[in-house]
A protein has these predicted regions:
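Short acidic-aromatic active-site loops that bind/stabilize oxyanions
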Residues: 7, 41, 54, 132-133
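A structured beta-alpha segment of the ubiquitous adenosine-cofactor-binding alpha/beta core
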Residues: 19-64
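Single conserved hydrophobic/aromatic residue that forms the stacking wall/gate
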Residues: 1-14, 18
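General structural signal for secondary-structure boundaries
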Residues: 11-15, 39, 61, 82-83, ...
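Generic structural signal for beta-strand residues in well-ordered domains
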Residues: 7-9, 44, 66
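Preference for short coil/turn "hinge" residues that link or interrupt alpha-helices
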Residues: 3, 31, 36-39, 53, ...
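Adenosine-phosphate binding glycine-rich loop
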Residues: 66-178
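Alpha-helix C-terminal capping/helix-to-coil transition sites in glycosyltransferase folds
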Residues: 13, 46-47, 69
């Protein structure tokens, strides 16, 4: 794939529509009209509502976590927030949606495809999206509830793990294995 934009950061006060033909024509967002070239470090530290690190690991570290101004960090890359940064962000009231939760959509849709292929089902695209939205929202709400229930003592990542363990334990009980 084309990785030219991995180390490129741009800021634009107004909405920046990357679906624009510019990316297609130039194969990069570099030089996007009206966008200001900034460092990746500056991008991470912008005063924004939601920050979505989506390309590289270890972007938010123990060193820069205290400078993150976003209210929410949604990890679309694998491991963009380091273990050292996670508690710092939580302490600073930055809600981190961990990669294992934020990235679960792709695996979930793969499961839907498996179900359809195995049992000969066909779901329209809209129905697939509705099922995915329900599962993702439920997973987020269960995780966030676990986080709030243990407020101050755990991170959202820990809450995600705790919900997963609870889910497995419940499945073991239902199957009569325990």
């Amino acid at each position: 794939g084309d990785h030219r934009d991995l180390h490129t950061a741009y800021r634009r006060q107004r909405q920046m529509c990357i679906r624009d033909s510019y990316k297609t024509e130039h194969h990069t967002v570099k030089g996007f009209p009206g966008a200001q070239d900034i460092s990746n470090e500056a991008l991470l530290e912008l005063d924004v509502d939601i920050l979505v690190p989506a390309a590289l690991q270890a972007q938010i570290t123990g060193e820069n976590a205290s400078r993150i101004k976003a209210k929410v960090v949604t990890e679309l890359a694998n491991g963009p927030v380091t273990p050292e940064a996670d508690p710092i962000l939580t302490q600073n009231n930055v809600l981190v949606v961990p990669d294992i939760l934020a990235n679960a959509g792709g695996v979930t849709v793969s499961y839907f495809e498996w179900i359809q292929n195995t049992y000969g089902y066909y779901w329209a695209e809209e129905e697939t999206y509705e099922k995915l939205e329900k599962i993702m929202k439920d997973a987020f709400h269960r995780t966030h509830e676990m986080f709030k229930k243990n407020e101050g003592g755990i991170t959202m990542r820990m809450a995600t793990d705790m919900v997963a363990v609870e889910h497995v334990a419940e499945a073991i009980k239902v199957k009569g294995w325990a």
